[in-house]
Amino acid sequence: IETTDGYITIVGSKNIVHKIHQMLEQTQERLYVLASGEILSEFMQDLQNLVAIGKKVVILSDDFEIPSAICHKTTTEKNQIRLITDSSYVLTGVISGNEHDTCLYSGQQNLVSVMKEALKNKIELLSK
């Protein structure tokens, strides 16, 4: 893990998976995630738990749904994940299951805002 001005580069699939689990466990209000069903299936229990305790969960995926979550069907880029928790933290990058996978994690408001806007635009397009 490498820190640069509020941005953390997370390298290796195991480290990324651990960070995602941690982010999901610490979600206070809402979660937005864009990823393939293959990636999201690894986090099924965490996602179901968030829905069960009343958190807002918005999923953009090719083939993944959870009852009571807001799900939008869309094409996804292979091995890509975009995750925003509580409008405060973002994780984006590649997770394919190997040690060379890399994700960027940040609580920097400018990156969070850019990512939120991108996901919002995608949701608006899917809703038309």
Protein language model annotation of sequence segments:
Residues 1-49:
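PLD-like (HKD) phosphodiesterase/transphosphatidyltransferase domain
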Residues 36-128:
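C-terminal regulatory/effector modules of DNA-binding transcriptional regulators
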